[in-house]
Amino acid sequence: MSLTTAPVPGQAWAFRCDVSSAHNLLIAAIGIQLALMLPSLAAVVVDDRLLNGVSVWSKPLKFQASLIMMLGTLAILLPLIESAAKNGWGVWIACLVAAMTASGEILYITLQAARGRASHFNSETPIETLAYGLMGIGAALLVLSSLAIGLYLLMRPAADAPRGLQLGGGWGLVLGSILTLVTAFALGSGRIGGPGHWVGGVHSDADGLFLFGWSRSGGDLRVAHFFATHVMQALPILGVLLGAIAPRLMIPGLLAGGVFSIAVVVGTFVQAIMGRPFF
């Protein structure tokens, strides 16, 4: 941890976090994702082992790409928080939690792929049962750290922060985090359609939707979870576009975007629990 010191009355030294260290935590975590993505890309070509009908390396690659986007979003939005809050312990701890949980999650997922073992819904051994439980806790903490940074963006924005990106980023992180937690709980509980992401249909990803792998024979809880997670990117992009094209419509536009995002997540979730494929 990088710290700076500054004298205050009545004390020899006081400590405060250096915002660059918080930002560097996120960059380091992105570096870990990239470092694992390169061999995963090579492995998917040369390793013909399958899990649930698709390459064992399919899941690590999807998670590596998703976590790069999530951590990158936090890194981009972090400078929009006003200086006092940005240099405080709250933001630093949120970034530390995000970096550690994202790194731990992807290391385990990649390790399990290398072993040819499932990382999710795997209780075949005591260690894997424990690891899956810890991964669930880590994923929740990762999302909560994003929620915290979103609240900082909304409540303590920098005076010179671009309004569209600041509002879109703040609401995107808050709304996206809440929706992600709800869909992740439903997905991970195993109470809808049994353990796994399938609801009805063939319990295999072999003939899944191109690129995403979503079931085409029944419901798939991953669809709603995907849209929930990427609200964190969609609303900031919408905010930037509205700020550049129609500043007066920024707030109503973001509200409409938020309502639409909720509708998409709820709609695809209901579709999945009814056992219907996305396409």
Over which residues does each language-model region extend?
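Short, Lys/Arg-rich, polar N-terminal cytosolic tail immediately upstream
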Residues: 1-22
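Membrane-interface helix-boundary motifs at transmembrane edges
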Residues: 17-21, 82-91, 155-165, 245-250
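Hydrophobic cores of alpha-helical transmembrane segments in multi-pass integral membrane proteins
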Residues: 25-45, 58-80, 94-113, 134-149, ...
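Interfacial helix-loop-helix junctions of multi-pass membrane proteins
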Residues: 44-55, 114-124, 193-194, 269-279
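Non-cytosolic membrane-interface motifs at loop->transmembrane helix junctions
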Residues: 51-60, 121-134, 162-167
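Membrane-water interface at loop-to-transmembrane-helix junctions
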Residues: 160-171, 220-224
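Aromatic-rich transmembrane-lumenal/periplasmic boundary elements in polytopic membrane proteins
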Residues: 165-199
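Membrane-interfacial catalytic/cofactor-binding modules of polytopic membrane enzymes
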Residues: 188-231
